[in-house]
């Protein structure tokens, strides 16, 4: 008896079985360690993890043995449920009255903003200078020696948290629960929206990647945006097809507006999505109709964004505008996984950190222009194109890339592949020249490259001479750590500099230093001797290199000067 394609009675393909098996294997990550960790501490979590571990073995067998496509889809759904329960068990294991509520600053700042909203106070333009001590979390240090202590996200997270923030026990990570709900909704939507053979990727990406747990647990607002952005990019090549938005187009626009009200990363996706929709519609419609339907879509998205933000625009005025853009304008200290590491690790610093920001902005513009010029080649990567530019920024952690990974696959795989070849492609005479066509991508990236070279090559503005160094054994009984030192700085630049000090023996810098003596600023050509004392007892840090660096940062202009604290000058004290 012949089977009808698409009926679910046909045999699964090797690709489908392979992806399903990879999804199961990904869920084994960390299971054994988690089971051992809770063997004597939390029997409820232990029983759940043991049951899941056993079920994963059974599901792996079923993946390779079921005979029909429909049966494998049901197994995939069971694997998705197992992934959800595994993630939930590991999440629950980190929650309790004896546990720290959050371990990073995003959740506490959103919590404080929600409390301010409930009491009728201002949300934007308000500072909470003691929130780090209140919640026991680390902070985001700034180039001016301070730290980020205000709510610097669009308001959706605070709006959602406000009804619950004063009713739940203080140890419940409310923002973590919202983030988990957002990730789960994204996984379920991906499973429903992806082609049948790719549905295991929903489990693999959302629940099988170990990096998500930390960020979800600590309530990163980007997970509130994720399900809305997923709906926005779903079948984007068909948005406004025939010049009519329809229900799918309206929902897509609304979700983009709401997603942009949850996190700023949605702002960077929006112009690429707008350009892609315009090119898709121009491929089938005259310019006027293509612009009209795309304009209606953009207007609905903007209207949804403004509607969510309207109460804060009225209440906080200009502070609202500065607040939602503060993450982009604040001068956070350098840290990341891109070219900034050249100045941070490989050289003694840079005299112009701002050039990294210019390089990132120019590459972002170049990526958008490249999409407009080569849509049929680049449109499959539309949801990925905004993020390479972030590699060039002074602060380029992995959160800008991997947390939005579900969008990369969904935007590509949910669109009919033939749609990419129907996109309108501008072909001016210059692009008819093969040599110019080959050289154009390099020309688009040249301004960003020049800024990057300028940032790396800019000489450091300070000359350092480290003299007296005092160390002490770390509080946890580890190796010795620097507790005080004396350093002479000479300003070799033509700008007035206000130095701020940090030290590091791994990827993270410690700003736990007090200037006991020394001038507050250095004039061009001026010198000053600074005596630095660590405020708290040092502790052994994971990933320590054995060498300790002194980092001197200035904010205006943004500069970084680094030097190794010579180990030969250290004298250990008790």
Write out the residue ranges for each language-model feature.
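Primarily membrane-embedded glycan-assembly and transfer machineries that use lipid-linked glycans
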Residues: 2-233, 237-241, 280-389, 393-397, ...
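Hydrophobic/aromatic-rich transmembrane helices and adjacent perimembrane loops
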Residues: 44-54, 224, 268, 397-431
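Membrane-interface alpha helices of multi-pass inner-membrane proteins
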Residues: 207-213, 229-230, 247-275, 307, ...
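Short aromatic-acidic-glycine turn motif
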Residues: 505-515
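Short acidic/polar inter-strand loop motif in beta-rich domains
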Residues: 553-562
């Amino acid at each position: 008896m012949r089977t009808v394609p698409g009926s679910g009675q046909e045999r699964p393909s090797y690709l489908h079985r392979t992806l399903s098996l990879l999804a199961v294997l990904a869920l084994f990550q960390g299971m054994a360690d988690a089971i051992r960790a809770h063997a004597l501490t939390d029997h409820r979590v232990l029983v759940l993890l043991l049951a899941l571990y056993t079920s994963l073995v059974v599901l792996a067998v079923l993946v390779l043995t079921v005979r029909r496509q429909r049966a494998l889809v049901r197994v995939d759904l069971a694997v998705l449920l197992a992934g959800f329960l595994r993630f939930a068990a590991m999440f629950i294991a980190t929650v309790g009255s004896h546990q720290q509520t959050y371990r990073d600053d995003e959740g506490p700042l959103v919590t404080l903003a929600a409390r301010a909203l409930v009491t009728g106070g201002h949300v934007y333009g308000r500072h909470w200078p003691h929130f780090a001590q209140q919640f026991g979390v680390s902070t985001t240090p700034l180039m001016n020696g301070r730290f980020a202590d205000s709510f610097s996200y669009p308001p959706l997270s605070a709006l959602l948290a406000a009804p619950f923030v004063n009713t739940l026990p203080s140890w419940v990570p409310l923002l973590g629960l919202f983030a988990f709900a957002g990730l789960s909704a994204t996984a379920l939507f991906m499973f429903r929206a992806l082609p049948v053979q790719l549905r295991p990727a929903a489990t693999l990406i959302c629940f099988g990647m170990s990096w998500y747990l930390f960020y979800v647990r600590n309530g990163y607002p980007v997970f509130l945006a994720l399900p809305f952005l997923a709906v926005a990019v779903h079948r984007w090549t068909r948005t406004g097809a025939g010049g009519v938005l329809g229900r799918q187009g309206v929902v897509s626009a609304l979700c983009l507006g709401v997603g942009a009200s949850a996190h700023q990363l949605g702002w960077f996706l929006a112009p690429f999505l707008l350009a892609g929709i315009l090119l898709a519609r121009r491929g089938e419609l005259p310019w006027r109709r293509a612009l009209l339907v795309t304009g209606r879509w953009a207007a609905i998205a903007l209207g949804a964004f403004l509607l969510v933000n309207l109460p804060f625009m009225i209440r906080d005025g200009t502070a609202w505008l500065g607040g939602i853009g503060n993450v982009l304008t604040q001068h956070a200290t350098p840290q990341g996984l891109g070219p900034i590491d050249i100045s941070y690790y490989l050289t003694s610093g840079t005299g112009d950190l701002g050039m990294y920001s210019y390089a990132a902005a120019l590459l972002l513009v170049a990526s958008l222009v490249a999409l407009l010029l080569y849509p049929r080649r680049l449109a499959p990567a539309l949801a990925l194109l905004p993020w390479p530019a972030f590699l060039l920024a002074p602060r380029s952690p992995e959160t800008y890339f991997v947390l939005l990974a579900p969008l990369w696959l969904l935007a590509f795989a949910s669109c009919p592949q033939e749609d990419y070849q129907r996109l309108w492609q501008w072909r001016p005479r210059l692009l008819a020249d093969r040599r110019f066509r080959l050289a154009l991508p390099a020309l688009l990236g040249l301004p960003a490259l020049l800024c990057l070279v300028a940032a790396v090559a800019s000489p450091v503005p300070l000359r350092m001479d480290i003299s007296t160094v005092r160390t002490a054994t770390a509080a946890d009984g580890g190796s010795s750590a620097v507790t005080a030192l004396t350093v002479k700085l000479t300003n070799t630049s033509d700008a007035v500099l206000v130095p701020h000090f940090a030290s590091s023996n791994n990827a993270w810098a410690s700003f736990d230093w007090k200037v006991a003596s020394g001038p507050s600023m250095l004039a061009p050509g001026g010198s000053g001797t600074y005596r630095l004392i660590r405020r708290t007892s040092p502790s052994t840090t994971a990933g320590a290199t054995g060498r300790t660096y002194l980092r001197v940062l200035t904010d205006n202009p943004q500069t970084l000067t680094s030097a190794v604290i010579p180990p030969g000058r250290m004298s250990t004290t008790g």
